[in-house]
């Protein structure tokens, strides 16, 4: 799809999310369009059902189909398989990073933190569907640095029961931090603080 088609799409299919993860979804990306989603198996989304904007705010609804043989059930935990709650938090960050790119942000995505996280349920192998609902509270493009920042409130549902909330989740896109020549040593092969 073209970059304009990407920015005007209101939903994304599984193959489109995987193509985005590998950097091949957009045929004519602008310079600096280095945002990616994690590739499977760490991609925690199967479909984006809705992505919309209303001024500096917006909304994202996405789903993940639960697979009995998912990698995390094999190791977390033996004789008591449950999807780690932190993966649900990461799914919210994944969605917010995608939202930044969809809004025209350039650079590579990084989770920046969140406020309170509350879990009141669990995801087991025989559950069927996780739904993520994110209310974007604010999207900002910082002209001086070229970074884009988004803040959202996330809720997780499993089979239509709410099981978690993630408050003040923050993600940003930052220019000049991509590491496309991995595993070679290069300017971005070592991490550290992003504000240097």
Give a label for each model feature.
Residues 1-82, 102, 107, 123-124, ...:
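Non-catalytic linker/capping segments at the edges of enzyme domains
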Residues 43, 112-114, 129:
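Short connector loops at helix/strand junctions that flank enzyme active sites
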Residues 79-81, 92-95:
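Compact, glycine-rich, soluble single-domain proteins
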Residues 89:
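Active-site beta-strand/loop microenvironment that shapes enzyme catalytic pockets
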Residues 94-103, 107-118:
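Conserved short alpha-helical segments that host acidic/polar catalytic motifs at enzyme active sites
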Residues 117-136:
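A structural-propensity feature for long, helix-poor, extended segments
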């Amino acid at each position: 799809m073209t970059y304009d088609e990407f920015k005007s799409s209101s939903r994304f299919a599984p193959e489109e999310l995987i193509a985005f993860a590998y950097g091949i979804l957009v045929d004519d990306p602008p310079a600096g369009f280095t945002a990616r989603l994690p590739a499977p198996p760490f991609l925690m989304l199967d479909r984006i059902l809705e992505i919309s904007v209303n001024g500096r705010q917006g909304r994202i609804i996405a789903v993940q189909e639960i697979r009995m043989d998912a990698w995390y059930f094999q190791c977390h935990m033996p004789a008591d398989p449950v999807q780690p709650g932190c993966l649900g938090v990461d799914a919210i960050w994944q969605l917010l990073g995608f939202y930044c790119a969809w809004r025209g942000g350039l650079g590579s995505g990084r989770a920046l933190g969140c406020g309170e996280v509350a879990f009141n349920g669990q995801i087991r192998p025989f559950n069927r569907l996780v739904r993520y609902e994110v209310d974007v509270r604010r999207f900002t493009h910082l002209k001086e640095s070229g970074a884009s920042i988004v803040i959202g409130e996330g809720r997780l549902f499993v089979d239509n029961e709410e099981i978690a909330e993630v408050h003040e989740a923050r993600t940003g896109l930052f220019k000049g931090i991509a590491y496309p020549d991995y595993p070679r040593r290069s300017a971005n092969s070592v991490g550290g603080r992003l504000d240097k």
